[in-house]
Amino acid sequence: MAVPKKSTKERLESLLDDLEVLSREVIETLALSRSQKLSQPGEENQILELLIQKDGEFQELMKVAFSQGKTHQEMQVLEKEVEKRDSDIQQLQKQLKEAEHILATAVYQAKEKLKSIDKARKGVISSEELIKYAHRISASNAVCAPLTWVPGDPRRPYPTDLEMRSGLLGQMSNLPTNGVNGHLPGDALAAGRLPDVLAPQYPWQSSDMSMNMLPPNHSNEFLMESLGPNKENEEDVEVMSTDSSSSSSDSD
């Protein structure tokens, strides 16, 4: 099993301890040799050589530590750059997600449009038919009055004579006695609507006509007034009868 290599810090601490021990031995040896005036040749030289050797190793290790310090500073700068790049990558990833969502939506809408186009091509209608249909609508004046319309013009949007005869007033004049001359159903008037026989038959007949009905106690008078001749018609009839009687007497 391989022994793990010591770090630079541990090696420096070990060398410093050795230097400290050697320095103490040198100092103690020199102190003893002076006090006792005893000197053993070669002992101080060995300690000094060992001290110089340890100092050389310490200097070499300090160079290594200095280079490692520079490397550590470079690593810190690179770590900051990596963090910045990582933030840029995350931002770009977010933008790519948004672009993916937009593209997916656009692709879905494009597919739906293609389906609509295919469906329209399968059920295509010629432009001539559209023009004919538009001409029919404009010619019948179903949506607006003619440009040359004047009061008295029977054309639309006012109802024609046939539509008037088929409408509410025409039906009221042709109803049987028990259906019109009597009182209208109370529930119909209470609900504010006309009976089914008097319901409007055309779109131009407004439903407001049923809302303008009088109360039940006045319905008979309202119907009789609407069905009966007015004062001007009575005077015209009297004048015509007088003229006819005078002409017959003259002929006699």
Swiss-Prot record:
Question: What InterPro entries does its record include?
Answer: Mediator_Med4
Asked whether the UniProt record includes Calcium among its keywords, one would answer: no
One Gene Ontology molecular-function label: transcription coregulator activity
Q: Which UniProt keywords apply?
A: Activator, Coiled coil, Nucleus, Transcription, Transcription regulation
Q: Name the cystine pairs.
A: none
Q: How is this protein annotated for GO cellular component?
A: core mediator complex; mediator complex
> What are the TM regions of this chain, as residue ranges?
none
Compositional bias annotation for Low complexity: 241-252
Presence of keyword Cytoplasm: no
Q: Which residues form a coiled coil?
A: 5-31, 70-112
Subcellular locations according to the entry: Nucleus
Biological process GO terms, please? regulation of transcription by RNA polymerase II
A Pfam family recorded for this sequence? Med4
- What function does the entry list? Component of the Mediator complex, a coactivator involved in the regulated transcription of nearly all RNA polymerase II-dependent genes. Mediator functions as a bridge to convey information from gene-specific regulatory proteins to the basal RNA polymerase II transcription machinery. Mediator is recruited to promoters by direct interactions with regulatory proteins and serves as a scaffold for the assembly of a functional preinitiation complex with RNA polymerase II and the general transcription factors.
Q: How does it assemble?
A: Component of the Mediator complex.
In the record, the note on similarity to other proteins reads:
Belongs to the Mediator complex subunit 4 family.
The protein, known as: Mediator of RNA polymerase II transcription subunit 4
- What organism does the record attribute this protein to? Xenopus laevis (African clawed frog)
Q: Which gene encodes it?
A: med4
